[in-house]
């Protein structure tokens, strides 16, 4: 009887892993048609740099703080699947008031302060409802995919990335067309409604996905203050501190790349889309390779490699102003920069998430993910706030505006954080030794065709 039950459980887990791939594709519609275009929408509604910094970063902090509610829900025995599909359903509904704000702005000329405040409120609610899902979903997926985490999520993220890229490209074409006929708001209505449909499908799939039995045990619970006190002695605590500080550094500049392109570089929506598509495209190609590498050599090895690449990206963005008189060269240069960005972020995002699965026990997964996200959210908010205040300074030197200061400060702090924190963190599982000389030797023996073949090879089929 036990054997039959085990076989049924394994079948349901495999089926759930396949549903999760489709759910990820639906999420890509939300991301590519919706979330990626919130900053351009805010600019259309007249928000300044400081407000945009708050718009992008404050919801991240609020969304992570409300994850403490998730822990309470789990403690009360509410199923992880219920938390996930209800949270995503409520998140879906927030697109209607966000669209309504634009309609009020363009049809009734309502005060900009009221519109900006409304956008912050409803976008914050959208992120909060999504944030509540995070710890429950991570714990849930940890039970479904107990082995080869890197390989599975490398493949899943590739599917999400492909959907996101196609969605972004389509959204860019829609916005460019309606801007050309002097109706940009109509374009945003269309892409946000498609984002709504994507998240609605995602929510429905989460409701169908199998959830293994889970009974939270109070002896595994610890407060956030207990967690903070143990950070100096805890390897996981040091890892959380590193990622949170990196998010602080990243969010000094992250909310303003769109502003930099649309204002300083005077890009149209299609040019903006081509540049912003590059990183998720490279992500899609490289995540499976990073997943295989991490499964063999450890997640921390990838974090160290990519963590030292991240400081270069905003510094290279600053140099784009020198190509402003050569638009084609400027586009090619930024595509190169975003290719490097995709290389770094593909590995960093995948392995920082997967490190948690290696470092944390099943019983403590939800609580550790919640605390991890809270630290990240606080870092994001403080970074975005500081970046926004600097970006609105009346600074101009040669071709450099205050946004250039924001980018350079972000680069400097990223470098400092990686240099100081990475040596303090250790790998948490047995992995193969990585020899840089051997890696260089193997790479030198590969032709460009070989490299493309490796990148295009699937990283394993989650159905098997």
Predicted regions and their residues:
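Juxtamembrane intracellular "pre-TM" segments in multi-pass secondary transporters
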Residues: 2-14, 210-242, 431-464
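Helix-loop boundary and gating motifs at the non-cytosolic
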Residues: 2-65, 70, 74, 81-87, ...
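Hydrophobic core of transmembrane alpha-helices in multi-pass small-molecule transporters
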Residues: 25, 94-95, 101, 109-133, ...
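Transmembrane alpha-helix termini and helix-breaking/packing motifs in multi-pass membrane transporters
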Residues: 39-44, 72-76, 99-109, 164-186, ...
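Helix-to-loop junctions at the C-terminal end of transmembrane segments
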Residues: 66-79, 175, 286-299, 391-395
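Cytoplasmic membrane-interface "Motif A"-like loop-to-helix N-cap segments
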Residues: 75-93, 183, 296-310, 398-401
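C-terminal ends and interior cores of transmembrane alpha-helices
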Residues: 88-113, 177, 308-328
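Intracellular juxtamembrane helix-capping segments at the cytosolic ends
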Residues: 130-145, 347-361
């Amino acid at each position: 009887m036990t054997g039959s039950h085990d076989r049924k459980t394994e079948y349901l887990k495999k089926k759930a892993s396949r549903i999760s791939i489709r759910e990820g594709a639906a999420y890509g519609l939300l991301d590519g048609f919706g979330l990626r275009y919130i900053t351009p929408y805010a600019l259309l509604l007249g928000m300044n740099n400081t407000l945009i910094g708050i718009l992008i970063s404050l919801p991240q902090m609020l969304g992570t703080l409300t994850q403490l509610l998730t822990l309470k829900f789990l403690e009360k025995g509410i199923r992880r699947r219920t938390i996930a599909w209800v949270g995503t359903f409520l998140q879906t509904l927030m697109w209607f008031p966000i669209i309504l704000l634009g309609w009020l702005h363009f049809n009734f000329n309502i005060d900009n302060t009221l519109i900006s405040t409304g956008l912050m409120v409803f976008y914050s609610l959208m992120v909060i409802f999504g944030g509540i899902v995070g710890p429950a979903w991570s714990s849930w997926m940890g039970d479904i995919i107990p082995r080869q985490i890197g390989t599975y999520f490398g493949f899943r993220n590739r599917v999400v990335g492909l959907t996101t890229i196609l969605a972004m490209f389509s959204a860019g074409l829609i916005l460019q067309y309606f801007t050309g006929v002097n109706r940009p708001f109509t374009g945003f209505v269309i892409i946000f409604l498609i984002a709504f449909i994507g998240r609605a499908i995602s929510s429905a799939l989460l409701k169908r996905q199998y959830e293994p039995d889970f009974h939270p045990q109070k002896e595994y619970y610890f407060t956030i203050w207990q967690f903070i006190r143990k950070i100096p002695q805890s390897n996981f605590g040091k890892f959380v501190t590193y990622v949170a500080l990196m998010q602080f550094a990243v969010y000094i500049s992250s909310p303003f790349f769109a502003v930099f392109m649309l204002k300083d570089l005077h890009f149209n929506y299609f040019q903006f889309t081509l540049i912003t598509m590059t990183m998720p495209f490279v992500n899609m190609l490289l995540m499976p390779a990073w997943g295989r590498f991490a499964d063999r050599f450890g997640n921390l090895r990838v974090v160290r490699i990519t963590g030292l690449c991240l400081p270069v990206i905003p510094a290279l963005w600053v140099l784009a102003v020198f190509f402003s008189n050569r638009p084609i060269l400027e586009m090619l240069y930024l595509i190169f920069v975003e290719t490097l960005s995709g290389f770094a972020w593909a590995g960093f995002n995948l392995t920082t998430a997967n490190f948690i699965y290696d470092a944390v026990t099943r019983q403590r997964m939800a609580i550790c993910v919640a605390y991890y996200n809270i630290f990240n959210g606080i870092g994001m908010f403080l970074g975005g706030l500081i970046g926004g205040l600097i970006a609105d300074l009346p600074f101009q030197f040669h071709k450099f505006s205050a946004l250039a200061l924001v980018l350079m400060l972000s680069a400097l702090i990223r470098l400092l954080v990686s240099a100081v924190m990475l040596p303090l963190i250790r790998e948490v599982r047995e992995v193969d030794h990585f020899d840089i000389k051997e890696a260089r030797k193997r790479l030198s023996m590969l032709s460009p065709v070989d490299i493309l073949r490796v990148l295009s090879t699937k990283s394993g089929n989650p159905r098997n």
